[in-house]
From Swiss-Prot:
Organism: Methanococcoides burtonii (strain DSM 6242 / NBRC 107633 / OCM 468 / ACE-M)
Function: Involved in the biosynthesis of isoprenoids. Catalyzes the 1,3-allylic rearrangement of the homoallylic substrate isopentenyl (IPP) to its allylic isomer, dimethylallyl diphosphate (DMAPP).
Positions annotated to bind Mg(2+): 159
GO biological process: isoprenoid biosynthetic process
Cell compartment(s), UniProt: Cytoplasm
Entry keyword set: Cytoplasm, Flavoprotein, FMN, Isomerase, Isoprene biosynthesis, Magnesium, Metal-binding, NADP
CDD domains to which the protein is assigned, alphabetical: IDI-2_FMN (cd02811)
Name the UniProt record assigns to this protein: Isopentenyl-diphosphate delta-isomerase
Reactions that this protein is recorded to catalyse: isopentenyl diphosphate = dimethylallyl diphosphate
Quaternary organization: Homooctamer. Dimer of tetramers.
Keyword NAD: no
Lineage: Archaea, Methanobacteriati, Methanobacteriota, Stenosarchaea group, Methanomicrobia
Gene Ontology cellular-component terms listed: cytoplasm
Amino acid sequence: MSTSKRKIEHLELCAKRPVESRNVTSGFDDVMLIHKALPQIHMDEIDLSTDFLGKSLKAPFLIASITGGHPDTTPVNAALAEAAEELGVGIGVGSQRAAIEDPEQESSFSVVRDKAPNAFVYGNVGAAQIKEYGIEAIEKLVDMLDADALAVHLNFLQEAIQPEGDRDATGVLEMIKEVCSLNVPIIAKETGAGISKEDAALLKEAGVSAIDVGGVGGTSWSGVEVYRAHDSGDAISEDLGNLYWDFGIPTVSSVLECRSFVPVVATGGVRTGLDIAKSLSLGAYAASAALPFVGPALIGADEVVSSLSKMLNELRVAMFLCGCGNINELRTSSKVTVTGWTKEYITQRGFDPKDLDIRSDL
């Protein structure tokens, strides 16, 4: 199957089928922001703006990589980009592999920069494709978008389940090091299985500028592949995908694992502004989500703006109730507790819950 056809299949499945984690959550329910009964600030004067990788954002949010690579995905990316431009948030594109294989698909990606000339836009390529296509081809992906950064996605769980997946991860860290020589920041991005502190240390050493943890709790790409396998009659891949549907490190745990190495983006089950606030209070520099905007984007930009505006208003309320007048205060001064499964996990991983308030300013 061509990459382009697979991309439209993925989009349709995410729009129509239940693809989120089944039995493992992101961990946000284990996180409690300590309420300030005396916030002593005006809610309407709270400043959501922040800087991320040298670019100013009106709010600490990125519309995560969703799609591209098929003509039918162009209006979806256009709607997302228009919303990003209007609200001043960042936006990523789906894997640009299809544009390497077929230059006619470039417009499904470049429309994002066309519709969002001032936004923080990041490109996207799989780690496996760096080895396959080489650094010059990857550089063209940056130029295609006039991108402010490039995400290198680590989706080896999906590759292991996908019948046509690339299962060769040899030399991947060296390839990432090579990509880090490009003249844009590189974001190492998991796609639903999270990143550990051990891998975060290796990625920092390789030269990445940020880590998007892509933890368990949101879209399960193993789950997406279950539907593809079922529809094609591939019972072995279907069973394998079901077994690994919830495999990996949940988002909150992964943020705590990675936060001391490089700036972190919290992705994976972020569904409300309260989730964004909790992410930043744990040390993330921004939060991100994709699935909540698929349905709205299929309708149009106004629907995306409405959905995202709701989340940003929820973030503002959370900041007000924590007495935080700006994003830096939320990241460095808010008080937070972690209980339940997440506390047990981070304790076993050597993280002292008493150190939650010690957040690095990287």
